[in-house]
Amino acid sequence: MGKATYTVTVTNNSNGVSVDYETETPMTLLVPEVAAEVIKDLVNTVRSYDTENEHDVCGW
């Protein structure tokens, strides 16, 4: 039996693009700097798929 993984997902509702971050240690996300970096990376990845309607995506 494998280790449990936990997933953080960011989705752009205007175009349906979704990106995930998986971790086996969700407690690390309680560290504000770590959580901010994870979310920033996810948002930037989602944003890279939206070239025409940038105002529809959460800016960072």
From Swiss-Prot:
Pfam families membership: DUF1869 (PF08956)
Gene3D superfamilies, per database record: YoaG (3.30.160.220)
Description of how the protein assembles with itself and partners: Homodimer.
Name of the molecule in the record: Protein YoaG
Gene source species: Escherichia coli (strain K12)
